[in-house]
Amino acid sequence: MDRDRADFQMAFDGLSTLGVKAVALQVPIREGEAFTGYVDVLTGKAYTFGADGAVSECDVPADVADDVSLLHDLTVENIAESDEELMEKYLEEGSLSLEDLQIGLRKGTVAGELCPVLVCSSLENKGGVAVLEAIQALLPAASERPAFVDALGQERKPDPDAPVAGFVFKTLADPFSG
């Protein structure tokens, strides 16, 4: 959110072209071009950032209230669709509890069916804590992951005593290349 003319809706909509079922967990709050906070789509609570990066609760701004409502409905439907039991409950009751949504979101994320979308500005130290909390809550620990075969054809299991294995990559767009 720290780039000039950053457009949340365009980025969110663009995820569908990647074949990903994106679920918006946050909607940015802006004052002009400045990223000043976010609305939690699941709870409907809004938060603003202080000068020191501290977060405080505030009212949902009128200019994003309709977007939050639409995204809330879409997010609930996508989470429900990712789990047969949740879908039945959603169809019977017409809604899901926050706890059901959080459990369904984690299951769908771990299964690779859902892609949570959050907002932050690392350059301005805004929203990073919420992103890290989402990573902790939604992604599986290494101990929950199955064994895999590495590039050398060896099976590797999660082991805290084994050497660190990682894959580092960077994407680059060169404006001068064809």
Where are the predicted features?
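Structural and coupling elements of P-loop NTPases
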Residues: 1-178
